[in-house]
Amino acid sequence: MIESQRHSYHLVDPSPWPISGSLGALATTVGGVMYMHSFQGGARLLSLGLIFILYTMFVWWRDVLRESTLEGHHTKVVQLGLRYGFILFIVSEVMFFFAFFWAFFHSSLAPAVEIGGIWPPKGIEVLDPWEIPFLNTLILLSSGAAVTWAHHAILAGKEKRAVYALVATVLLALVFTGFQGMEYYQAPFTISDSIYGSTFFLATGFHGFHVIIGTLFLIICGIRQYLGHLTKEHHVGFEAAAWYWHFVDVVWLFLFVSIYWWGGI
């Protein structure tokens, strides 16, 4: 006999994915340490752990999509909780980048004697901010406008237009990533070239990683939009992707102004 549910909350069924994800993370961590210290079997254990994590992510998110789209477990109350949770996740990401900017300004506002007492450090040839960095700024801002276009299309019930807008967003994101990779390849300094190289590649590389994650997030949203999963009443997944993408936009603006422009003067 099925008991009636007298509340708006989603009580999830028992799932094997939390423990499988934990085992994958353990294997990845141990394998990574073994690989870095050249222990036999480290690379295999690291690869196995990563595969396990990716598989767990796929099947876990698949179950969440089933629960929300097909089974109707994501009520208004559940959706509100998901929104609050994702906002807190973005706040935690802000703290990550705050630490990177702190390291950059700590090093640049009071340059140590080891780097010549100047910023950029002596011997460092910086990148021109008005070449690829400025072009990437325009591309990323355009992608932010495109994802907003997709949001308005979803709210208006225009499914095809939303798909087109998401495709445009993803294409712009891929172009941005390509230019970023080109910039890294052509950079006249490396991550080991003083504190400048360390903070530059750490901050911009971490941002680039977020761009890749956000691109995958938007691709999934585009597929779901094409399949008719997203409606104007229920599109929390897309909202989370859009918020994440706007966060990536804002971080890039800070990176461009502080590290590329001001930090290269």
From Swiss-Prot:
InterPro entries per the UniProt record, alphabetical: Cyt_c/ubiquinol_Oxase_su3 (IPR024791), Cyt_c_oxase_su3_dom (IPR033945), Cyt_c_oxidase-like_su3 (IPR000298), Cyt_c_oxidase_su3-like_sf (IPR035973), Cyt_c_oxidase_su3_a-hlx (IPR013833)
Membrane-topology descriptor: Multi-pass membrane protein
Enzyme kind, highest EC tier: translocase
Keyword Cell inner membrane among record annotations: no
Keywords on record: Membrane, Mitochondrion, Mitochondrion inner membrane, Translocase, Transmembrane, Transmembrane helix
Source organism superkingdom: Eukaryota
One term under GO cellular component: mitochondrion
Catalysed reactions, as listed in the record: 4 Fe(II)-[cytochrome c] + O2 + 8 H(+)(in) = 4 Fe(III)-[cytochrome c] + 2 H2O + 4 H(+)(out)
EC number: 7.1.1.9
Pfam family, one: COX3
Places the protein is found: Mitochondrion inner membrane
Bilayer-crossing regions: 41-61, 85-105, 137-157, 162-182, 200-220, 245-265
MF annotations from Gene Ontology: cytochrome-c oxidase activity
Family: Belongs to the cytochrome c oxidase subunit 3 family.
Protein purpose: Component of the cytochrome c oxidase, the last enzyme in the mitochondrial electron transport chain which drives oxidative phosphorylation. The respiratory chain contains 3 multisubunit complexes succinate dehydrogenase (complex II, CII), ubiquinol-cytochrome c oxidoreductase (cytochrome b-c1 complex, complex III, CIII) and cytochrome c oxidase (complex IV, CIV), that cooperate to transfer electrons derived from NADH and succinate to molecular oxygen, creating an electrochemical gradient over the inner membrane that drives transmembrane transport and the ATP synthase.
Other notes: A stretch of 270 kb of the mitochondrial genome is duplicated within the centromere of chromosome 2 resulting in the duplication of the gene. The expression of this duplicated gene (At2g07687) is not demonstrated. It is also probably not RNA edited and therefore differs in all the positions known to be edited.
Protein name: Cytochrome c oxidase subunit 3
Native species: Arabidopsis thaliana (Mouse-ear cress)
